């Protein structure tokens, strides 16, 4: 390969550098390396093995005792590690522990050894689900089940974490690539269908009791009722993040098993308490024929504000059994929370009048058990 070397103020070549994981640096079986060269910095970023198919071919790695190539980039095994060269000149190598380096900035805030054991089952991988997945990946969650039947289209891009290069693929596949780009060690299972049809063996493999949370992101009450019931079966928590017209407001509901909480079906399954957009009508994120409705889709910043509050609750719930963890919101928000982006009727209509001011987050709403439950969730009483 040919490269352009960066120069300093005096026109001198800036030293070239290789970034590579400790695992790869000491891999004596390595024969080729893939990644990317950045000509503005003079850095060769050797991609982890799990992402090698996304990188450009950088060069070969030769056996111990070999003479470095006089032309281009190569590596030579020396004792128990690879030394890198550019046209025969040895290059500075900076190795890193992949997991430790990626999550080093979380130290003291989140315990990475705790977070890597957690699993998130994300139902709906659109604008909400994609943000949830990306932030949990950054927080160190290492196990995912992604469930969505939709294909990423161009009208999704302005509100989705994936981009134009992903258009045409299933949302679950596109999102899996994004997660692995943050943590190549993540274990991500995908299902290109609705939660009601997901094979049980996928969840049996991935869901660990009290270490798993199901996240309803599809604005579909039927799916949320079903997902909460499955979560209870696996002794897993459940949270739903949904939106009202134009995403001027949203609602967040969570259920933690064996905490004497009403499940989603009891609390919100009928839809009587909320102005949330009903099942399968993704008006806030995916509506294509905008002129056929009375309001417009919500913009990304409104969707993300409410979703971020839900993500904080997810992280709190996943760490609720960790004695050293300090909750951000869980001790202050009720099981059912409303969040508004604006209190202007010109955007939200008459329903917006229930909010006193913009960015209001409720802390006093209470939901109860349904008529089929006498003070305890009937789903939790069912035999597994």
Please give the residue ranges for each predicted region:
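Glycine-rich phosphate/adenylate-binding loop
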Residues: 1-90, 206-213, 217-384
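A short, basic/flexible loop-to-alpha-helix module at the beginning of a structural domain
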Residues: 92-120
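Glycine-rich adenosine-cofactor-binding loop
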Residues: 110-153
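Generic beta-strand/beta-sheet core signal
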Residues: 123, 147-149, 191, 216-217, ...
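Glycine-rich phosphate-binding loop and adjoining beta1-alpha1-beta2 segment
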Residues: 149-185
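Generic structural signal for helix capping and beta-alpha/helix-loop junctions
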Residues: 153-154, 197-200, 248-250, 273
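A structured beta-alpha segment of the ubiquitous adenosine-cofactor-binding alpha/beta core
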Residues: 176-212, 217-221
């Amino acid at each position: 390969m040919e490269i352009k070397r960066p120069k300093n103020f005096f026109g001198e070549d800036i030293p070239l550098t290789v970034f590579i994981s400790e695992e790869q640096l000491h891999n004596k079986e390595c024969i080729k390396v893939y990644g990317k060269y950045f000509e503005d910095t003079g850095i060769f970023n050797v991609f982890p093995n799990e992402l090698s198919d996304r990188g450009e071919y950088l060069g070969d790695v030769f056996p111990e005792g070999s003479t470095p190539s006089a032309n281009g980039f190569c590596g030579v095994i020396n004792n128990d590690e690879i030394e890198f060269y550019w046209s025969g000149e040895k290059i500075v190598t900076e190795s890193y522990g992949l997991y430790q380096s990626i999550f080093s900035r979380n130290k003291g805030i989140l315990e990475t050894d705790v977070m890597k054991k957690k699993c998130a089952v994300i139902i709906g991988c659109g604008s909400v689900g994609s943000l949830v997945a990306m932030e949990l990946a950054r927080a160190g969650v290492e196990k995912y089940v992604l469930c969505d039947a939709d294909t990423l289209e161009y009208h999704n891009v302005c509100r989705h974490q994936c981009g134009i290069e992903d258009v045409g693929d299933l949302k679950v596949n596109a999102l899996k690539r994004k997660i692995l780009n943050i943590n190549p060690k993540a274990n991500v299972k995908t299902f290109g269908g609705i939660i009601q049809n997901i094979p049980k063996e996928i969840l049996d493999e991935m869901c660990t009791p009290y270490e798993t949370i199901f996240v309803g992101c599809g604005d579909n009450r039927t799916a949320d009722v079903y997902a909460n019931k499955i979560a209870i079966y696996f002794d897993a928590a459940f949270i739903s993040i949904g939106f009202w017209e134009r995403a001027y407001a949203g609602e967040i509901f969570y259920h933690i098993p064996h905490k004497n909480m009403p499940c989603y079906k009891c609390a919100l399954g009928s839809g009587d308490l909320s102005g949330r957009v009903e099942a399968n009508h993704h008006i806030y994120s995916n509506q294509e024929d905008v002129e056929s409705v009375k309001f417009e889709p919500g913009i990304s910043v409104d969707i993300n504000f409410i979703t971020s509050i839900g993500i904080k609750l997810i992280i709190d719930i996943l760490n609720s059994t960790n004695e050293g963890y300090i909750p951000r919101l869980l001790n202050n928000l009720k099981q059912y929370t409303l969040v508004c982006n604006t209190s202007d009727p010109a955007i939200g209509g008459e329903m917006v009048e229930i909010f006193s001011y913009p960015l209001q987050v409720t802390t006093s709403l209470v939901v109860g058990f349904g008529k089929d439950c006498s003070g305890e969730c009937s789903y939790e009483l069912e035999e597994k």
